[in-house]
């Protein structure tokens, strides 16, 4: 199972956009093994990433943009179909990625969930994608997609890809019940809390070449009590003579509501720990 996205690598910028899909596509071309891989990629939600679209407009989940994004991903991936096509984050305005907890309802023009599903349905019918999934979605959003697909006879969401780890267990509130009852698979990403659960950033450490040094966008795991919680997890790992990375990954992998644990490596040498 390979998971990527049209905007990768991160942080998103014009110079590197699509590079991860190109790497995977070249790998498929060399190995001739496309049919042995379940391939997932993602289309950007609403964001000011004007370099992604031909008309330089901000990204959104309009039918036109989704069709354009799929075609470009297929070219980069050197394939004629995508097994799982995911909405990277919601099209509607909302708090995301470590924002404040005091939710404020934000009204704004957005593509309806029905229209998004309708566009994805066309892509399934012509064979460019096979299944659809969500990412960084809320319990309400997940249920609304399921509701619309049932009522309008449109494709059903098969998965949701959200962050889940020892420092971020928000998915257990609402999300876990939905995936059980509705049979929607959780693809859990960031099992190491973007590296924090390895302990390498403790006491202000900043290893050279680490994700935090390369692009410091990890403040969501630097809140009050985070360092103390990490220290306690490190103590547990030490007590049982296991690597902290393995402890964190096994926690995610063994949860009964997790379908797959998505591991992201900055360097190939990290694979030994995971």
PLM features: residue spans?
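Basic phosphate/pyrophosphate-binding loop/patch that engages nucleotide-derived ligands
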Residues: 125, 171, 175-185
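A structural motif corresponding to the C-terminal end of an alpha-helix
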Residues: 31-33, 76-81, 119-130, 182, ...
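Glycine/proline-rich, positively charged
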Residues: 52-161
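Conserved small/polar residues in nucleotide/adenosyl-binding loops
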Residues: 267-274
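Conserved, mostly hydrophobic/aromatic
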Residues: 2, 24, 39, 73, ...
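Active-site beta-loop-alpha junctions enriched in small/polar residues
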Residues: 7, 42-46, 87-90, 135-140, ...
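Glycine-rich, positively charged active-site loop/lid region within alpha/beta enzyme cores that binds
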Residues: 49-50, 93-105, 180-236
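N-terminal binding-site loop/beta-alpha segment at the start of enzyme catalytic domains
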Residues: 1-43, 67, 71, 80, ...
């Amino acid at each position: 199972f390979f998971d990527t996205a049209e905007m990768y690598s991160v942080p998103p910028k014009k110079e590197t956009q699509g590079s991860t899909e190109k790497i995977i596509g070249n790998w498929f071309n060399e190995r001739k093994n496309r049919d042995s891989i379940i391939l997932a990629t993602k289309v950007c939600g609403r964001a000011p990433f004007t370099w992604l679209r031909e008309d330089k407009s901000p990204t959104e989940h309009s039918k036109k943009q989704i069709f354009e994004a799929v075609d470009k991903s297929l070219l980069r991936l050197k394939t004629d179909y995508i097994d799982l096509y995911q909405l990277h984050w919601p099209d509607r305005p909302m708090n995301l990625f470590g924002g404040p907890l005091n939710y404020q309802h934000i009204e704004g023009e957005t593509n309806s969930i029905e229209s998004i599903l309708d566009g994805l349905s066309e892509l399934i019918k012509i064979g460019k994608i096979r299944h659809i999934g969500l990412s960084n979605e809320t319990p309400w959003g997940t249920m609304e997609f399921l509701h619309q697909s049932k009522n309008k006879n449109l494709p059903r969401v098969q998965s949701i890809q959200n962050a889940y780890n020892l420092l971020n267990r928000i998915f257990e509130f609402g999300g876990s019940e939905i995936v059980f009852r509705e049979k929607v698979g959780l693809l859990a990403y960031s099992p190491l809390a973007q590296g924090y659960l390895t302990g390498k950033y403790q006491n202000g450490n900043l290893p050279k070449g680490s994700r935090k040094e390369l692009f410091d966008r990890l403040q969501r795991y630097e809140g009050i009590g985070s360092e103390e919680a990490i220290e306690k997890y490190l103590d547990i790992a030490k007590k049982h003579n296991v690597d902290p990375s393995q402890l964190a990954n096994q926690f995610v992998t063994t949860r009964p509501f997790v379908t797959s644990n998505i591991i992201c490596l900055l360097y190939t040498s990290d694979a030994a720990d995971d």
